[in-house]
């Protein structure tokens, strides 16, 4: 019983994504994003670099000048929850986004890529 209580408290404190995703699998999922984004260095491509993505305000990479008005005007801070929503269907989550990617339909893929982003912090 004590073990179950600890698991519940841990899940509530750290969120499901902290335990659900596999960063190694997430790195493989990220290959779908590499044509537009990088995570290794602060260099933009078609989309902004994703260095330091977790905890960053959306639309805040100063060197990236092609954000949509919707992205710049949003008050989103990227975390597991906001990334999951956005990566499910970017255009539905944020009307007016310029991101052409249709989204990651598989929940496991989203969990894994979020774990990958978290591992880069």
Protein language model regions, located:
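Electrostatic cytochrome c docking/interface patches
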Residues: 14-30
């Amino acid at each position: 019983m004590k073990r179950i209580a600890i698991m519940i408290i841990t899940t509530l404190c750290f969120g499901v994504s902290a335990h659900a995703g596999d960063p190694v699998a997430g790195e493989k999922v990220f290959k779908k994003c590499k044509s537009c984004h990088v995570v290794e260095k602060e260099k933009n491509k078609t989309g902004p670099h994703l260095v330091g993505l977790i905890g960053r305000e959306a639309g805040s990479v100063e060197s990236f000048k092609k954000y949509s008005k919707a992205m710049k005007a949003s008050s989103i801070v990227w975390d597991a929850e906001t990334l999951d929503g956005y990566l499910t269907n970017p255009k539905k989550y944020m009307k007016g986004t310029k991101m052409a990617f249709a989204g990651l339909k598989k929940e496991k893929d989203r969990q894994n890529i979020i774990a990958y982003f978290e591992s880069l912090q």
